[in-house]
Swiss-Prot record:
Domain of life: Archaea
Enzyme class: transferase
Major subcellular site: membrane
Protein name: CDP-archaeol synthase
GO molecular function per UniProt: CDP-2,3-bis-(O-geranylgeranyl)-sn-glycerol synthase activity
EC number: 2.7.7.67
Transmembrane segments: 15-35, 59-79, 84-104, 118-138, 142-162
């Protein structure tokens, strides 16, 4: 078994603190979304919806705002209220990543609720980290990102199963 020193655990904890606004944005969109689809029902030339009914205007906005609120909360804890901007960027990236994931699923012929392993779990994570990097030119160390991606896969599975059992989701993935 590989042992991680306390410094490694600290870096992983910092990474989790960093990505928390994206996690909460993704969860908030699921819990409080619904309503009008972000794509307004539009179809592309292939006859398939642009995004589908699962990506909604309300969910997108709630997700972005939730990310900003979590960022603000983190900022208040560490004495830097500008962290709200980080939370906004991470929330926006998470919602954009989720929308891109839905776009890809529609293009390959998968309907809403159809499983797309890894894509379903990491689209918001990749979107958040990518947008943060594009805006600020920074991301956690590579090994921390890999650790967070693995943690995200596990947490996503767990929260989806819980959501399914609580009848908040139609499918457990």
């Amino acid at each position: 078994m590989v042992e991680m020193g306390s410094g490694a655990w600290l870096e992983l904890g910092k990474g989790l603190w960093f990505i928390l606004p994206a996690y909460i944005a993704n969860l908030s969109a699921c819990l409080f979304g619904g309503g009008r689809p972000l794509d307004f029902g539009k179809k592309l030339s292939d006859g398939r919806r642009l995004l589908g009914d699962g990506v909604t205007i309300r969910g997108f906005i709630v997700g972005v705002l939730a990310g900003a609120v979590v960022g603000l909360g983190e900022g208040l804890v560490v004495g830097d209220p500008w962290k709200a901007g980080d939370g906004f960027i991470l929330g926006l990236g998470a919602m954009a990543g989720d929308a891109v994931g839905s776009f890809v699923k529609r293009r390959i012929g998968l309907e809403r609720g159809a499983p797309a392993p890894v894509l379903d779990q990491l689209d918001f994570f990749v979107g958040a980290v990518l947008l943060y990097y594009l805006v600020y030119g920074w991301h956690p160390p590579g090994w921390v990102l890999v650790g967070l991606a693995i943690l995200t896969l596990a947490l996503h599975w767990l929260t989806n199963v819980i959501g399914y059992l609580l009848k908040l989701k139609e499918v457990p993935w």
